[in-house]
Regions:
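Condensing-enzyme catalytic core mediating Claisen C-C bond formation in acyl metabolism
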Residues: 1-25, 171, 229-298, 302, ...
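N-terminal extracellular/periplasmic Venus flytrap/periplasmic-binding protein-like
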Residues: 12-13, 24-28, 32, 41, ...
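Conserved beta-ketoacyl condensing-enzyme motif
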Residues: 23-111, 116-135, 204-220, 315-334, ...
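Short, well-ordered amphipathic alpha-helical segments that serve as non-catalytic structural scaffolds
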Residues: 27-42, 66-70, 95-98, 162-169, ...
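Conserved catalytic cysteine-centered active-site region
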Residues: 56-111, 156-162, 227-256, 337-367, ...
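Flexible glycine-/small-residue-enriched beta->alpha junction loops
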Residues: 110-172
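Active-site pocket-lining segment
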Residues: 164-167, 203, 211, 284-356
Length: 405
């Protein structure tokens, strides 16, 4: 018998810029801060957690199966298992989906799910050294950059990385530079307004950073820019301009490389009532889809179609949409496929997204859920959609329904 899986207290750390305020912290340390904060907020005893599932896109052997390592370092009993999920940019959402499946099936009653990423600390590596590669020289790869060009495997190479995929969509959907910059400014304005109103503070677990100067408690996102303007963004040079004179994708209309962690409790309504937890949403359905790797940014379209079909809903039934902004060109391409008009911006990324808040890839899905669930609650709306594109040519989507208090 299938049970409903509900989401309680989705939270996240502040989001740090690349090489910014969290550069000294590992993904594990960010995850530990988020998990401890979640348990403190909810009063859930560590031994009541039956699994810890974390999305993580840039792992190394310092923290294998990061869900388990974070659980142990956060002080959970050794009897609490944990694992790592990697569906690239969709990893955090996939972790939540996996937790919902475990709860729905009856295998677990309470699971912690989310993600953690420190893009500032992604490792450099070599595949040449173990068997005497030094004889002919050793090649060192930047793990952060390498994964973006190899995600299509042997037969679908994308030498220009994710930037190339955004330019491909820009070209296919006739998206102008001005449209991209306008979306980027709108994103920053939404995020800054949410910061100033205190809305984002509800989902944030403060993090303490220790340095030679002492301890600093950080409770605010670092990436949003209050001074961003279309005029300022127009001055930025497209990253692939040398390869493509028509290129339009810049650092200003792309998502950031960021550091953060996100967590939530996935359980049943009955267990939530027993523990005094308040469910915000339940997962209605989810869907994943594959697309050509060189246009990976269009992935949310078929993934959303699959999720909506399972839910018996249309896009018009959705009150709030979290569509991750990997690139402005990519987000606009999806919106064009959805035939969005100006009014649809009033329900899409209403508190900012990847361009403004940042995109700490493994943690992004949990960040989006924290915003979506709370915004549904604030507005007393019914349905929310969370969806993102995925490097390598995928899309992931999930439909959530607000749980009445």
């Amino acid at each position: 018998m299938t049970r409903d899986a509900v989401i309680c207290e989705p939270v996240r750390t502040p989001i740090g810029r690349y090489g910014g305020m969290f550069a000294s912290l590992t993904a594990v340390e960010l995850g530990v801060a988020a998990l401890k904060g979640l348990l403190e907020r909810t009063g859930v005893a560590p031994e009541q957690v039956q699994d810890v599932i974390l999305g993580h896109c840039y792992p190394n052997s310092e923290a294998p199966a990061i869900g388990r390592v974070v659980a142990l370092d956060a002080g959970l009993p050794v009897t609490v298992p944990g694992m790592q999920v990697d569906r690239r940019c969709g990893s955090g959402l996939q972790a939540v989906i996996q937790a919902c499946l475990q709860v729905r099936s009856g295998d677990n009653d309470l699971v912690v799910a989310g993600g953690a990423e420190s893009m500032s600390n992604v490792a450099f590596y070599s595949t040449d050294m173990r068997w005497g590669g030094a004889r002919g020289g050793v090649q060192i790869h930047d793990g952060l950059a390498r994964g973006r060009t190899t995600a299509g495997g042997q037969f679908y190479p994308v030498p220009g990385g994710m930037l190339e995929t955004a330019e491909n969509l820009r070209r296919e959907y006739c998206i102008t530079r001005a449209e991209q910059d306008e979306l980027a400014v709108r994103s920053h304005q939404s995020a800054v307004a949410a910061q100033r109103s205190g809305v984002l503070a509800e989902e944030i677990i403060p993090v303490t950073v220790t340095s030679r100067k002492g301890e600093t408690v950080i409770d605010t996102d670092e990436h949003p820019r209050a001074d961003t303007t279309v005029e300022a963004l127009a001055k930025l040079k497209p990253v692939l301009l040398k390869q493509d004179p028509d290129a339009t994708v810049t650092a200003g209309n792309s998502s950031g490389q960021n550091d953060a962690a996100s967590m939530c409790i996935v359980t049943t309504a009955e267990k939530a009532a027993e523990l005094g937890l308040r469910p915000l949403v339940r997962m209605v359905s989810w869907g994943s889809a594959g697309v050509a790797p060189d246009v990976m940014g269009i992935g949310p379209v078929p993934a959303t179609e699959a999720a909506l079909a399972k839910a018996g809903l249309q896009l018009g039934d959705i009150d709030l949409i979290e569509l991750n902004e990997a690139f402005a060109a990519q987000a606009l391409a999806v919106m064009k496929e959805w035939k969005f008009g100006e009014a649809d911006f009033e329900r899409t990324n209403v508190r900012g997204s990847g361009i403004s808040l940042g995109h700490p890839v493994g943690a992004t899905g949990g960040r989006m859920l924290a915003t979506l669930a709370r915004e549904l609650d604030h507005r007393q709306a019914r349905y929310g959609l969370e969806t993102m594109c995925i490097g390598g040519g995928q899309g992931l989507a999930a439909v959530f329904e607000r749980v009445a208090a």
